[in-house]
């Protein structure tokens, strides 16, 4: 009798998997049309993509927080728009979503470089930050692992979020120090998860945004974030090349809002 019940159970599971597979194949792939600001206003919905971290976008039970989330939500409310914000850890997927029209803008601090300007239109700079090395603090007997400066990166493996703008800087460093730096791109984790992995000893080095690293360093008493990988750079939101009117609308609003007391309170909340 038990054997029959087992067969029935297995048969039911197999049938369920077949039904799910058939449904997934029959479900049409959602198509998106690239939009500019007038299209967004007509729809009443602003679609943004961001990175899930304590600075940009963070969900804690029923509350949503984050500098980029709160700032963009203020813009949306001022324009009577509903904000839809999607977290996406992969920079490449965020860029793909913008290009295909799935999202209207990337609302997380994105480094403004000559290369990134080839694919995105950037708002006026929102922040200044830089890429830093996350490593464990110097320990007796393990000093060989501690990096004092960029010249000591030769032969080391740096873990970086896949598609991160930090990759370009690391490749430049390879030329500058005339030595090999191994790069391990990670697509399933963000910078905060990489920090936890360094702290736990799973990896030795990661490259993260300084603002995110400083916001989380209090959680890890054994971490050091004092070695710079890049110089200070501008960070901004990015919109698609096909959305110049959206860019102008964002910039006009940001120019006014960043002078307000509300913005000063918001900035102080996330950047002390």
Spans of model-derived segments:
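Hydrophobic membrane-insertion alpha-helices, especially the h-region
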Residues: 8-22
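Extracytoplasmic small-molecule ligand-binding "clamshell" domains
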Residues: 8-9, 26-110, 114, 118, ...
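Ligand-binding clefts/hinges and TM-proximal coupling segments of bilobed small-molecule sensing domains
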Residues: 18-30, 163-186, 221-226, 257-272
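Periplasmic-binding protein-like
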Residues: 52, 127-135, 140, 187, ...
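Hydrophobic residues within well-ordered alpha-helices
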Residues: 75, 98-99, 153, 197-199, ...
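A ligand-binding cleft/hinge motif common to bilobed small-molecule-binding domains
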Residues: 92, 96-99, 108-119, 169-176, ...
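Flexible hinge/capping segments at coil-to-helix
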Residues: 137-158
């Amino acid at each position: 009798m038990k054997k029959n019940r087992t067969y029935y159970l297995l048969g039911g599971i197999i049938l369920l998997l077949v039904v799910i597979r058939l449904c997934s194949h029959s479900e049409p792939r959602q198509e998106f049309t690239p939009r500019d600001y007038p299209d967004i206003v007509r729809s009443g919905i602003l679609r943004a993509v961001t990175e899930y971290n304590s600075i940009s976008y963070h969900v804690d039970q029923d509350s949503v927080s984050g500098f980029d989330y709160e700032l963009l939500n203020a813009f949306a409310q001022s324009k009577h728009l509903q904000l839809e914000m999607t977290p996406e850890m992969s920079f490449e997927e965020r860029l793909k979503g913008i290009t295909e029209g799935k999202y209207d803008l990337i609302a997380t601090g994105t480094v403004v470089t000559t290369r990134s300007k080839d694919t995105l239109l950037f708002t006026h700079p929102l922040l200044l930050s830089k890429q830093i090395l996350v490593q464990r603090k110097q320990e007796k007997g393990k000093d060989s692992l501690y990096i004092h400066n960029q010249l000591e990166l030769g032969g080391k493996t740096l873990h970086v979020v896949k598609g991160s703008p930090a990759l370009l800087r690391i490749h430049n460093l390879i030329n500058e120090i005339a030595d090999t730096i191994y790069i391990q791109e990670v697509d399933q984790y963000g910078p905060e998860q990489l920090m936890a992995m360094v702290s736990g000893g799973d990896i030795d080095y990661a490259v993260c945004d300084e603002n995110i690293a400083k916001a989380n360093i209090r959680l890890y008493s054994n971490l050091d974030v004092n070695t710079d990988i890049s110089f200070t750079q501008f960070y901004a939101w990015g919109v698609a090349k096909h959305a110049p009117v959206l860019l102008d609308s964002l910039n006009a609003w940001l120019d006014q809002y960043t002078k307000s007391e509300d913005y000063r309170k918001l900035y102080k909340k996330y950047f002390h």
